[in-house]
Amino acid sequence: MVRTPCCKAELGLKKGAWTPEEDQKLLSYLNRHGEGGWRTLPEKAGLKRCGKSCRLRWANYLRPDIKRGEFTEDEERSIISLHALHGNKWSAIARGLPGRTDNEIKNYWNTHIKKRLIKKGIDPVTHKGITSGTDKSENLPEKQNVNLTTSDHDLDNDKAKKNNKNFGLSSASFLNKVANRFGKRINQSVLSEIIGSGGPLASTSHTTNTTTTSVSVDSESVKSTSSSFAPTSNLLCHGTVATTPVSSNFDVDGNVNLTCSSSTFSDSSVNNPLMYCDNFVGNNNVDDEDTIGFSTFLNDEDFMMLEESCVENTAFMKELTRFLHEDENDVVDVTPVYERQDLFDEIDNYFG
């Protein structure tokens, strides 16, 4: 429910300062009837004022027990202590000071006591020293500096760990690059020998196999086709590599017999794929203990087990750098496919 207003706007109520005649009418009515009934009091007392205005005029000015004059030191101390306890509840503070009104206490607090506390360095709201707050703010940068130092230390540790990881990754990628270049040269050399010899790779020094292909052709229909071969298990083993050139014979019935007889050849690059690096070792004026040659230090198994200590060797790194620089400009000539189409058919049968 909404409380009805104490005064009606259409009555033409008077506002502003009170006149002595109005004060006299209010005093005479309250002395006869006492306090209370403020909503109907103006009409009964013959005043064109609001009931609230009559109440405040009586409580703050016309009441006989109101204490006039300046506030004493005891009253100021009481106001400060009560304000610390109740805050801005002026009516509660006024009950602790007989003869003083809440409005008077509020005005005196805002115009005198509050400014005096601020000059003394006391917060008028919390009634605590203002310097305590500044001390806390001064302590904050020290804590922040400690946190910054610890974070910088952690960053240094993280950078050191990242550098170690990057070093390991760079070493691994470097060795993989070398291995890929060696494998590329070996594969190109073997493929060139296969194409040049006229047949696929068939045997090594460890095992020699003969590949025979028999094809029977009839003028009307194809009777039978059979082939058998045994490829080598390792293309890069140390030893002599054998190939099988193709020979063809025709019999009386029109059958074609294709026989691949084995022939051997030796490839220096296959027997020792790292031999071409020995020239660098011979040209360097370095002691035998500090010199690491690719042909003596690395082979098919040792290269994969190359340790990180080899990367740190200065002579080894110089030798390896020259090798890679030369390898970038090296071009291996390979016979075009269209010139060896018939031989590539045999290679496809072999690798298929």
From Swiss-Prot:
Source domain of life: Eukaryota
Expression induction or repression: Up-regulated by touch or wounding.
Low complexity: compositionally biased ranges: 203-219
Keywords: Activator, DNA-binding, Nucleus, Repeat, Transcription, Transcription regulation
InterPro entries: Homeodomain-like_sf, Myb_dom, Myb_TF_plants, SANT/Myb
Annotated SMART domains: SANT
Expression tissues: Expressed in vegetative parts of the plant, mainly in mature rosette leaves and in trichomes. Detected in roots, but not in mature flowers or siliques.
Subunit structure: Can form complexes with MYC2, MYC3 or MYC4.
Protein name: Transcription factor MYB51
Gene coding for it: MYB51
